[in-house]
Curated annotation (Swiss-Prot):
The keyword Secreted applies. It comes from Alopecosa marikovskyi (Wolf spider). Negative results: does not affect mouse P2RX2 or P2RX2/P2RX3 receptors. Disulfide bonds join C3-C16, C10-C21, C15-C32, C23-C30. One of its GO terms (cellular component) is extracellular region. Expressed by the venom gland. This is Purotoxin-1. InterPro entries: Spidertoxin.
Length: 35
């Protein structure tokens, strides 16, 4: 399956291995970051 790389939005797709979906304080603009 497809996964989001680092810095890619993860609103509708999950992040690749070793990455975690993080959002800003408002809970928007979720992007994948290193764990």
């Amino acid at each position: 399956g497809y996964c989001a790389e680092k810095g890619i939005r993860c609103d509708d797709i999950h992040c690749c291995t070793g990455l975690k979906c993080k959002c800003n304080a408002s809970g928007y603009n979720c992007v994948c970051r290193k764990k």
